[in-house]
Amino acid sequence: MGQKVNPHGLRVGVIKDWDSKWYAEGDFADYLVEDYNIRTFLKKKLYAAGVSKIEIERASDRVKVIIYTAKPGVVIGKGGAEIEKIKAEVQKLTDKKLVVDIKEVKRPDKDAQLVAENIALQLENRVSFRRAMKSCMGRAMKAGVKGIKTTCSGRLGGADMARTETYNDGTTPLQTIRADIDYGFAEADTTYGKVGVKVWIYKGEVLPTKANKEGGAK
């Protein structure tokens, strides 16, 4: 059943960390909707900047938003003008003090979300789906990943009947919990309709740390 579950969600608390880090009792639903609105807005606004993921941390009086991007210059803008505009717009979505931090994704070819968005962009530009998938997979393998699997679903090449095509390179052990699997999903808006793109990237094994009796880590 490894293909049917989000690999990140399966590994959260074992080798992966949460994207939202906060605790709430009565306000849980409000915070959840607020997080969703912040992420949706930033993803749409900064799509050209190649945003890999957005982490949100909350304290009693402030919200910290960490944006992981392949192009930090696009997010920050000339003299920090763009980031100030973004801060002002995101501030409207929350009533707490907002802190925005930008972190660069050094190797975008090894990031599953960015690879999926790259394939989707090529499909929108009428590149053959096979060429788009295989070129991105080749770059990822050259970047040093252990394995990559890509799937495209929809009216591929303008066919009358929708279908799914999958390509693999290397190994992607989806059922091994200690395997560091990065997963990304994107949609391409083509003239024939939407095409879904999924990418799994295997980066190697990570051994989970167990807390010992003294409270340290083994």
Swiss-Prot record:
This protein's UniProt keywords: Ribonucleoprotein, Ribosomal protein, RNA-binding, rRNA-binding
Record-linked Gene3D superfamilies: 3.30.300.20, Ribosomal protein S3, C-terminal domain
Give every KH type-2 domain span: 38-106
Q: SMART domains given for it?
A: KH (SM00322)
Q: Name one GO molecular function term.
A: rRNA binding
GO annotation, cellular component aspect: cytosolic small ribosomal subunit
The record ties this protein, via InterPro entries, to: KH_dom, KH_dom-like_a/b, KH_dom_type_2, KH_sf_prok-type, Ribosomal_S3_C_sf, Ribosomal_uS3_bac-typ, Ribosomal_uS3_C, Ribosomal_uS3_CS
What Pfam families does the record point to? KH_2, Ribosomal_S3_C
Which PANTHER family did the record assign? 30S/40S RIBOSOMAL PROTEIN S3, SMALL RIBOSOMAL SUBUNIT PROTEIN US3C
Q: Name the HAMAP family on file.
A: Ribosomal_uS3_B
> What function does the entry list?
Binds the lower part of the 30S subunit head. Binds mRNA in the 70S ribosome, positioning it for translation.
Assembly mode: Part of the 30S ribosomal subunit. Forms a tight complex with proteins S10 and S14.
Family listed: Belongs to the universal ribosomal protein uS3 family.
The name this protein goes by in its record: Small ribosomal subunit protein uS3
Look up and give the organism this protein is from. Answer: Agathobacter rectalis (strain ATCC 33656 / DSM 3377 / JCM 17463 / KCTC 5835 / VPI 0990)
